[in-house]
Amino acid sequence: MSTKSMIRDVELAEEVLSEKAGGPQGSRSCLCLSLFSFLLVAGATTLFCLLHFGVIGPQREEQSPAGPSINSPPVQTLRSSSQASSNKPVAHVVADINSPGQLRWWDSYANALMANGVKLKDNQLVVPADGLYLIYSQVLFRDQGCPSTPLFLTHTISRIAVSYQTKVNILSAIKSPCHRETPEWAEAKPWYEPIYQGGVFQLEKGDRLSAEINLPDYLDYAESGQVYFGIIAL
């Protein structure tokens, strides 16, 4: 029953009793009835307000400012996915600065990484399992001045698959830092030429991957992290 209906019923009851009541006793009865009616209406109004503004009644479940509980399914799914990805093959090798005149990959320097079955053999990364892999590599060339003959710098990533044992280039780039010869009377200014390559490939267990260049004498080893090669299982 709504509050308006309750008030209407009380008013009708007052009118009926007022007509029937007479004399002093009737006046006192009307006064008591009016007081009771007022209290009833006030109580009903208060109850309606409390229910309307949610002070009483069913309580809503509140979320903490930090978000959902740590036991919620999305967090569990994310944790499971993270644990699964940590078991995937990954490798990151860097250039051996103690091998001038050639590009030799090394897995024992700081920031190098070999995990979950990947091996470095004969300067090649050996894939431990079938799947999709991100393959990436960067080299940095540098020198001063430009020769009279054209200078072309190449960077190639190749694959030797277990299924056909033929070396195939899967990523390749070529750059020319010099557009004209530096005159004899001019100052030979330094130049830098980075080449970065990366792509996703379907590989098989036992595939061998190599990253090579054509002119290792131009490699820049001045800073760590400039020449690297790696794979990440997806």
UniProtKB/Swiss-Prot annotation:
Any one Pfam family match given in the protein's UniProt record, by short name: TNF
InterPro entries in alphabetical order: TNF, TNF_alpha, TNF_CS, TNF_dom, Tumour_necrosis_fac-like_dom
Residue numbers of Phosphoserine PTMs: S2
CDD domains in the record: TNF
Domain (THD) ranges: 89-234
Biased composition range(s): Polar residues: 69-87
GO annotation, cellular component aspect: cell surface; extracellular space; plasma membrane
Extracellular side, ranges: 57-234
Subcellular location: Cell membrane
Post-translational modification: The soluble form derives from the membrane form by proteolytic processing. The membrane-bound form is further proteolytically processed by SPPL2A or SPPL2B through regulated intramembrane proteolysis producing TNF intracellular domains (ICD1 and ICD2) released in the cytosol and TNF C-domain 1 and C-domain 2 secreted into the extracellular space.
Domain of life: Eukaryota
Residues carrying lipid (N6-myristoyl lysine): K20
Annotated site, Cleavage, chain positions: S34, L35, L39, L40, C49, L50, L51, H52, T77, L78
Chain positions carrying an annotated carbohydrate: S81
GO MF annotation terms: cytokine activity; tumor necrosis factor receptor binding
Any one GO biological process: positive regulation of protein-containing complex disassembly
Keyword Lipoprotein attached: yes
Subunit structure: Homotrimer. Interacts with SPPL2B.
Protein role: Cytokine that binds to TNFRSF1A/TNFR1 and TNFRSF1B/TNFBR. It is mainly secreted by macrophages and can induce cell death of certain tumor cell lines. It is potent pyrogen causing fever by direct action or by stimulation of interleukin-1 secretion and is implicated in the induction of cachexia, Under certain conditions it can stimulate cell proliferation and induce cell differentiation. Induces insulin resistance in adipocytes via inhibition of insulin-induced IRS1 tyrosine phosphorylation and insulin-induced glucose uptake. The TNF intracellular domain (ICD) form induces IL12 production in dendritic cells.
Family: Belongs to the tumor necrosis factor family.
The protein's name: Tumor necrosis factor
Organism lineage string: Eukaryota, Metazoa, Chordata, Craniata, Vertebrata
Gene transcribed to yield this protein: TNF
